[in-house]
Regions:
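Active-site acidic short loop of glycosyltransferases
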Residues: 63-66, 96, 119-120
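C-type cytochrome heme c attachment motif
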Residues: 75-82, 146
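Thiol/disulfide oxidoreductase modules built on the thioredoxin-like
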Residues: 116-119, 128-174
């Protein structure tokens, strides 16, 4: 059976089991309404307040005017884990581009994970309730990993479902203007 299909099925089952709840039984944060209240998924993502591993809240809106690479991942996702060192190397190569890993997992699992595998870019937690967010952003299966490259003006440059190809992503990043 196709590995991507298996991964997507696993994510869908996890989402169904989680029922929209994140770590410690809290309801997943609801995305803010878009500028006109129309539910623009990119605007919603930019405004979404997400905790880092220390519990401090952040949003992508804080990086307005800068190119951003957002990587949705999970500790249990083998392709996600494989691509993290490659994303870390690209982040170091392009210091003017903001990178963030948004964990579709619990803060406790991510904390244990980073004790073994460290990255230099920030990791935020969205929890299992993220599947809806992923779908709205153009990932109908809600599969992981899922990477979105944003231009400095906040528009989407490209979406990558599945493991990144470092040389391919490098070409995209080299063309971004800060």
């Amino acid at each position: 059976m196709n590995r991507r299909l298996l991964l997507s099925a696993g994510v869908a089952i996890a989402a169904a089991v989680a029922g929209g709840y994140t770590f410690m039984g809290r309801k997943a944060p609801a995305p803010a309404a878009g500028p006109a209240g129309g539910g623009d998924p990119v605007a919603d993502l930019m405004q979404l307040q997400l905790p880092d591993l220390a519990g401090a809240s952040h949003s992508l809106a804080g990086w307005k005017g800068q190119p951003i690479v957002v990587n949705f991942w999970a500790t249990w996702c083998a392709p996600c884990v494989r691509e993290m060192p490659e994303l870390d190397a690209l982040q170091k190569k392009y210091p003017d581009i903001r990178f963030v890993g948004i964990g579709v997992d619990s803060a406790a699992n991510i904390q244990k994970f980073v004790e073994k595998v460290q990255v230099s870019y920030p990791l935020w937690v969205i929890g299992a309730g993220a599947i809806d967010t992923l779908r709205k952003l153009g990932n109908p299966a809600g599969g992981l990993p899922f990477t979105i490259v944003f231009n400095a003006d906040g528009s989407i440059n490209r979406k990558i479902l599945g493991e990144i190809q470092p040389d391919d992503l490098d070409k995209t990043l080299s063309g971004l203007k800060a």
